[in-house]
């Protein structure tokens, strides 16, 4: 009887672990997520969950630096996939309801985020090689940003300082394009 009981507990524990691993793997970005609308990448809620980070680097020599700090009741979320090689992502998110979903599928792509402030939601997709995105949100609030680059050698620089309630969507499809967005509020 003892063996049967311990066998049942082991099966129940194994089932629970499989269920939990399924939940975590559903959070990780995959290359097939490139087919989704960019805002669909943020549908994972952070309600009551605090910080979260789901990272998948499939290629060689990809680098990720991620810092998230939670100071409120709900948290930051980051979902990162770097599929090619030699991609670099440097992500800093601080308090409140920040989210980020980043896909860099090609090679030699660079992404950097310095974020502070309130209700930030970001989606960044770089599908190509030698692309660069730099975002700085200084003392900002309620920012929703979607930046998509499909092609090679493209660059987006977005600097927002003391901005209240912004919503950006920039899509570059092609090669060798550059956009600089700099806004300063009071």
Which positions does each model-derived feature cover?
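A short glycine/proline-enriched turn/edge-strand or helix-cap micro-motif
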Residues: 1, 25
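Hydrophobic helical h-region of N-terminal Sec-dependent signal peptides
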Residues: 13-18
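Bacterial N-terminal signal peptides that target proteins for export
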Residues: 2-12
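N-terminal signal peptide c-region/cleavage motif recognized by signal peptidases
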Residues: 19-23
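Low-complexity repeat regions of mature extracellularly deployed or surface/particle-associated proteins
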Residues: 27-186
